[in-house]
A protein has these predicted regions:
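Glycine-enriched, solvent-exposed interface loops adjoining structured elements
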Residues: 1-102, 107, 113-325
């Protein structure tokens, strides 16, 4: 048996488009699709994928992210151009200071860096930020130009005030900061000792009914407001101590856009055919496809999409049924 021993097959944006147009008889395999038609089809493909995201897609678009808390801050805006620091958890290094910091410090020194799995790491992060809990209780975010196995170099902006030996430090790259999420699936509070506590996700009406929204303590509730440009996390009560640094969340995101011909879909490859047939269904209206063909394409497209939504996009987890008392 002559097997390939490879499992890296994928498709590009233009592969999906050309296959979809063939399904409705709009082109042959040897045809060159005009750029204007490719552009129109790419627009339909992007809107189609975004619509699917609104329906609850998808397991592979979920990530564990960390929101760094500021003492006394109630509202955190995340997304492009925002000032809150919400970062992919697997991109964060942490350590503890072995040398105290002052406002004159240009570098920080830690015993060693660890990743989120508590494994020692020494990879240079490059440009990013160091998050340092100062003696004042404020979480200070300082730009860094580079990191080593035991420290990092500030990028012209030193800490705002002192930080003692033993203070916790987190480091991460600029590119690991998240874009606007679609929804929050779960949230937990994490303290410096590694202990966690669940945070209740509440709706807007319940949040509005909370009295004294600036009450301080350990956050127990959070409202997620997705907005259009920058999403907002509203926590209650607001963090007030050096004990709680983070809220760890499972977030769901949009898949990447199809911006260029060679872009691959941010989907498992088993979704390729569903993308092709559903794009064909969308494009059949624009190409004047006859009703019979359009109906057949629609039936196949809907079937392929529903099968994957019902089977491939589900977690492997046990379901327990119990008799009501």
């Amino acid at each position: 048996v002559a097997l390939s021993a490879s499992k890296n097959f994928t498709v590009t944006r233009d592969d999906i488009i050309t296959m979809a147009l063939r399904k409705i008889g709009a082109n042959d395999a040897a045809d060159v699709i005009p750029a204007t038609e490719l552009s129109a089809a790419a627009l339909s493909l992007n809107t189609l994928v975004k619509e699917w995201t609104g329906e609850g897609l998808a397991l592979w678009l979920r990530r564990t992210c960390v929101l760094f808390l500021q003492s006394g801050q109630q509202r955190y805006k995340v997304g492009s151009g925002t000032t809150a620091f919400c970062v992919n958890q697997d991109s964060i290094y942490y350590g503890t200071l072995t040398t105290a910091l002052t406002t004159a410090s240009t570098t920080l020194v830690v015993t060693t860096w660890y990743d989120y799995q508590d494994k020692v790491v020494s990879t240079n992060l490059g440009t990013g930020y160091a998050a340092i809990r100062l003696d004042s209780g404020v979480m200070d975010f300082c730009p860094i130009t580079a990191s080593s196995a035991t420290g990092a170099t500030f990028s012209g902006t030193p800490v705002d005030s002192a930080a003692a030996i033993g203070a916790k430090v987190y480091a991460f790259t600029t590119t690991s900061m998240i874009t606007r999420p679609v929804r929050v699936l779960s949230a937990t509070r994490l303290n410096n000792n590694g202990n966690t506590a669940e945070i209740s996700l509440i709706g807007r009406a319940d949040y509005d009914l909370l009295s004294q929204k600036n009450s301080s303590g350990n956050p127990t509730q959070m409202h997620f407001d997705p907005q259009l440009d920058a999403a907002q996390f509203l926590v209650w009560p607001v963090a007030n101590s050096t004990d709680t640094n983070q809220i760890v969340m499972t977030l769901e995101f949009y898949p990447d856009d199809f911006d260029a011909a060679a872009n691959n879909p941010e989907f498992p490859i088993e979704w390729a055919n569903a993308l092709v047939w559903n794009l064909a269904m969308e494009m059949s209206f624009e190409y004047g496809t006859d009703v019979r063909t359009r109906t057949q394409v629609a039936q196949i497209a809907i079937s392929k999409k529903n099968i994957l939504f019902d089977t491939a996009d589900r977690e492997n987890a046990s379901v327990t049924f119990a008799v009501s008392q």
